[in-house]
Amino acid sequence: MSLEDSRISNEDDSELLPPNKVVSSHGVFMASMNGSPQKIMRPSSVSGGSVNGSVSGSSQIGSGPNSNNNNNSSNNNNNSGSISSTKVIEALHEQIDALTNTNLKLTVQSQGLLEKLENSQQREGKFMENIASLRHENDNLSTMLNRKTRKLKDTELELEELKEKFDKITTEKKVLDDDLNKTSASETKLKEEMSMIENQYNSLIDSHEYYKDKYLQEINQLKRSLEDLTTEQENYLKRTNENNKLVEEKIDNYNNSFNQLKEINESLNNIIITKCESAIQELDLPNWVNLYKESKILVIDYAQQMNLEIPNNFKELVRDRTLEILESRSTSMSSQSSSENRQQFNNNNNNSHNQSSGNEEPLRMVKLRTVSPNSFNNSGSSLPSHIKRSSFYGGTKSLSSSNSGIPGTLPGVKRSGSLRKPSSRLPSTNTEPFSSPSSPSLNGTNKFGQNQNQASNSNSNPSQHNNSNIQLPGSRVSSVSHNPMHRKKRNSMMFHGN
């Protein structure tokens, strides 16, 4: 390779390489050039070849590790190659001169290029600063532009709103103008009416004053009349107070008399109650209920035996609520009375065995009743007050132990049970179903078996009290009288349906 080619290649490389790399390669080249003249001045043996080979050999002599061996060989060959070495040295001096010239040129060019590079770098820094400032300004301008655009949009919206408000205000103005015209017209009318009203008001004031004087006179007259009326009313109140006092005294007297009458009525009611209770005791209602039971049973038995149909009237009679209540009460009372009778019978037997012989038959207790002088029988004949008779089912025969029937049964139904024990008659307080306040009234009757109208009549007419007939509801039993002939008819009594 020739020196010019190497120079051209170095120039091309310097042009192609960046500025920093050119500076570093130029420093290495200058250092090699400073050390090359001393090495070239030393003697060296060059074995034929190209210029590049000699240059490389001389460079290797100065830098390789076998420099002593090369010096010895060069001394040996010094005599033989003295002629050729002078030529080579001259050629090398020429090349060195050319290279120094080229190197100087290159250094000058490199210094110029370095100055240009520094200038370009300074320009580039300035340009970069300008670019950054311009970018910053661009950002600021873009933000400003965005703000302006937003403000423009807001102003456009405000403008539209203002336009709408303007339109509304214009329409309102038109409406208000119309209203103003109307109000002005109405104002003129009102002014005219006001003038008319003022005239009317003045006339009313005049009339008011006239009527005021007139009514004041009338009020004074009314006050006078009112004072007269108050005096009259005070006198009337005094009179009424006196009359009220008299009336209160009379009312007190009336209350006292009423209380006395009430006490008298209560005493009369107590007398009536005692008489009714005595009449009920004489009637002996539980035995009648037992008689009703046995007769009902007999009727049902006879109808079954004779294959007869029981009439509907009898069925309705049997289904009567009051009779069912009486039956239920009689069964409960009969159970109690039977237990009491058994205890009394056992006590009597024990007493009879302890006292004396047991062959004596117990006497039958006969209940005697007094007949009031005002009582009448069914035939209308009166009985004297001194006549006393036996009980309702009277009989004076003593009972034997073999003929004693079921306690509580009545005669006339079964011949075997026609006689009763003395203990079968129960006190009216236990056997009377009407004595309890909770017992229901029978077909509008009061608790003594009488109708309320009859009870009031009996209070007014005590002579008719003992003549009142007691009849079971729903039955056609003949009236019970105090006739002594009733003992003969007791076996022939029957219950008939409605």
From Swiss-Prot:
Coiled-coil stretches: 86-272
Compositional bias ranges of the Basic and acidic residues kind: 1-10
GO molecular function, one term: RNA binding
Chief location category: endoplasmic reticulum
Record region (Disordered): 1-82, 328-361, 394-498
One Pfam family in the UniProt entry: SHE3
Cellular location(s): Endoplasmic reticulum membrane
BP GO annotations: endoplasmic reticulum inheritance; mRNA transport
Record field: compositional bias (Low complexity): 44-82, 328-360, 450-471
Superkingdom to which the source organism belongs: Eukaryota
Cellular component terms per the entry's GO annotation: endoplasmic reticulum membrane
Keyword Nucleotidyltransferase part of the UniProt annotation: no
UniProt KW Isomerase keyword: no
Keywords annotated in UniProt: Coiled coil, Endoplasmic reticulum, Membrane, mRNA transport, RNA-binding, Transport
Composition skew (Polar residues), residue ranges: 397-406, 425-449
Membrane topology according to the record: Peripheral membrane protein
InterPro entries assigned to the protein according to its UniProt record, in alphabetical order: She3
Family of this protein: Belongs to the SHE3 family.
Function: RNA-binding protein that binds specific mRNAs including the ASH1 mRNA, coding for a repressor of the HO endonuclease. Part of the mRNA localization machinery that restricts accumulation of certain proteins to the bud and in the daughter cell. Required for the delivery of cortical endoplasmic reticulum into the emerging bud.
Listed name of the protein: SWI5-dependent HO expression protein 3
Record organism: Vanderwaltozyma polyspora (strain ATCC 22028 / DSM 70294 / BCRC 21397 / CBS 2163 / NBRC 10782 / NRRL Y-8283 / UCD 57-17) (Kluyveromyces polysporus)
Taxonomic lineage: Eukaryota, Fungi, Dikarya, Ascomycota, Saccharomycotina
Gene name of the record: SHE3
